[in-house]
Amino acid sequence: MAAGGGGSYDPLAPAGVPCAFSPDSQAYFALASSDGQLRVWETANNRLHQEYVPSAHLSGTCTCLAWAPARLQAKESHQRKKRKSEVTGTKDQADLLALGTAVGSILLYSTVRGELHSKLTSGGHENRVNCIQWHQDNDCLYSCSDDKYIVEWSTQTCKVKCKWKGDNSSVSSLCISPDGKMLLSAGRTIKLWVLETKEVYRHFTGHATPVSSLRFTTIRPNESQPSDGITGLYFLSGAVHDRLLNVWQVRSENKEKSAVMSFTVTDEPVYVDLTLSENKEEPVKLAVVCRDGQVHLFEHILNGHCKKPLTSNCTIQIATPGKGKKVTPKPIPILAASFCLDKMSLLLVYGNWFQPTIERVALNSKDTHICLERDISNCWAPTVETAITKVKTPVMNSEAKVLVPGIPGHHAPIKLPPAQPKEAENKRKLGSTEATIEERLGAMDLDRKGRKDDLQTNSFAVLLTQGLESNDFEILNKVLQTKNVNLIKRTVLRIPLRVVIPLLQELTKRLQGHPNSAALMIQWLKCVLTIHASYLSTLPDLVEQLGTLYQLMESRVKTFQKLSNLHGKLILLVTQVTASEKSKKMTSPGQKAKLVYEEESSEEESDDEVPEKDSDDNWDEDEDKDSEKDEGVDEDNEEEDEDMEDKEENEEDREVSSEKELNGDSDLDPENESEEE
């Protein structure tokens, strides 16, 4: 996170909270803690100057902040002198501080008046504000958000002047060029915009993770470059979970778009400050605060491409003094660092965010490693033990009637013992009879097996809350493996709202595990979504929080039809296999037949076997007879043909004889006639 701007942060980390030094004089140091409060400290005497708590500091926590530039402050101060009601005549009247929130609104806070100056909401962002940049010449400021848009605001009218889409994903960082005509924006890729036309001038490769800081390192381009005010300038970029800070140069469109050089540090950079180079011979001084609490100092002349990453010239650490041999020095995290006006000293902010220590340290160019011993035992630093001791258990009278269960996360109310009469004192009276041990044991009612202790109605809710806050696997298993639906509903109804999202995340993680546990988690998920639907609908980042769960449910629903078909087929196959196995094992009951057919005896069968041999001979004889019959038939046919021929000849003879008779001729002799007869 660069000074004067805001970036993404992790509230649980020792560093990474939105903070910034006031411009030019660095008289104030502003930081927004994770509890939503804004604190302004005086750097000269390390005294708390102001403290401001926004009305919606719990739901809309501060995500980034930026001081108004000194030039704009002087202009605002001159305008305010005209008012009689605010005749202060000081330049600090317009020390405005812009605060970006998690719900998309921007607050303008006046450190002089100690109250809210104005609020920018209408027509702006719909999601978390990641970075704010003031324009150095006019009354505009620019903001970017997770909703992918960049918004140009007017601080006088508190309205949107222009709004355009900056990237396909969330835009995490902004930076205005020294001449005020260009704007750098970054998500994962870096874009250079022309503010007048809102068009992209150049594209840069960027980082693999979201960019958290952008800073121009030079004011004027080199003399060899075209004098368009932007070509040839260098700027610096740092990203989340990236130990390299890349340096880019604005070149012509046809040239390479990768980084010209890079600086390497020991951990992720959380705060970056630098001194601008006014000419090509002046080196750039860079101070990088890492998440591990160290400060790395670099000094390099930007002149073209450099292949190897550059290491720091000096490293600064702070530790507690080791008093004696038994006491080990402990490191003190450095939270922020900024160069002073002389560029030879450094303002360090270290300790904790509730009571930071601000110190000015002189730089020595000869030392490569500086370790400062500081005692911060006098500074108030809340610990876990002090937080636990502040939780007090309410004491209730035995006659009081409790209408609602106790607050989840606290112990059950402790009832006062019944008031004892004054006679039951420890003092013994002379002459009084003392009860025996047997009588005392009988009065103590040691038989507790028949009795049942009064169960706390909120015990499961308390266990679930403690398990989610401490991430205790055993406690979560004990609670989430409950199969009683009524108990699940009562538990979900009593949990506090702050653990609803962690509970949904835990259920989503368990839904991806074993199928047996997933069936139980569905009951919990159904109760949570049903009971706390109104609360979930008010969350601004609900889509990101429940995106994994939604995709998981969609994938399960898409495969449900196929799984049901497969389930039906498998049931059919298994049923048939089991039925066939059962039928084999079962014995059929004995039944009497209505009709019995008895075949011939075996003796008759043996007699019948002998003719079977003769049947072959008979078969041959039959074949011979058939062949003879066929021959006889052929002979008969031949005889019939001969008879027919004889008949035809006789008819012809008769015709001849009849003709002769008609003619009177007769060739027949008596002898021949007798022969014929």
Swiss-Prot record:
Detected at low levels at least in heart, liver, lung, spleen, thymus and hippocampus. Residues 581-590 have a biased composition (Polar residues). GO terms for cellular component: chromatin; fibrillar center; nucleolus; nucleoplasm; small-subunit processome. WD repeats lie at residues 13-51, 57-119, 124-163, 166-205, 207-258, 266-308. It is found in: Nucleus, Nucleolus; Nucleus, Nucleolus fibrillar center; Nucleus, Nucleoplasm. One of its GO terms (biological process) is positive regulation of transcription by RNA polymerase I. The modification Phosphoserine is found at residues 77, 398, 588, 658. Keywords: Isopeptide bond, Nucleus, Phosphoprotein, Repeat, Ribosome biogenesis, RNA-binding, rRNA processing, Transcription, Transcription regulation, Ubl conjugation, WD repeat. It comes from the Eukaryota. Pfam families: Utp12 (PF04003), WD40 (PF00400). PROSITE patterns: WD_REPEATS_2 (PS50082), WD_REPEATS_REGION (PS50294). Residues 581-677 are annotated as: Disordered. GO terms for molecular function: RNA binding; RNA polymerase II complex binding; transcription elongation factor activity. Residues 598-654, 664-677 have a biased composition (Acidic residues). InterPro entries: SSU_processome_Utp12, U3_snoRNA-assoc_WDR, WD40/YVTN_repeat-like_dom_sf, WD40_repeat_dom_sf, WD40_rpt. Its main location: nucleus. There is a cross-link at residue 308 (Glycyl lysine isopeptide (Lys-Gly) (interchain with G-Cter in SUMO1)). The modification Phosphothreonine is found at residues 320, 393. There is a cross-link at residue 308 (Glycyl lysine isopeptide (Lys-Gly) (interchain with G-Cter in SUMO2)). Ribosome biogenesis factor that coordinates hyperactive transcription and ribogenesis. Part of the small subunit (SSU) processome, first precursor of the small eukaryotic ribosomal subunit. During the assembly of the SSU processome in the nucleolus, many ribosome biogenesis factors, an RNA chaperone and ribosomal proteins associate with the nascent pre-rRNA and work in concert to generate RNA folding, modifications, rearrangements and cleavage as well as targeted degradation of pre-ribosomal RNA by the RNA exosome. Involved in nucleolar processing of pre-18S ribosomal RNA. N-terminal domain is required for nucleoplasm location and C-terminal domain for nucleolus location. Part of the small subunit (SSU) processome, composed of more than 70 proteins and the RNA chaperone small nucleolar RNA (snoRNA) U3. May be a component of the proposed t-UTP subcomplex of the ribosomal small subunit (SSU) processome containing at least UTP4, WDR43, HEATR1, UTP15, WDR75. Binds to RNA; binding is required for its chromatin association. Interacts with CDK9, DDX21 and SUPT6H. Interacts with RNA polymerase II. Interacts directly with UTP4 and UTP15. Belongs to the UTP5 family. This is WD repeat-containing protein 43. It comes from Mus musculus. The lineage of its organism: Eukaryota, Metazoa, Chordata, Craniata, Vertebrata. The gene is Wdr43.
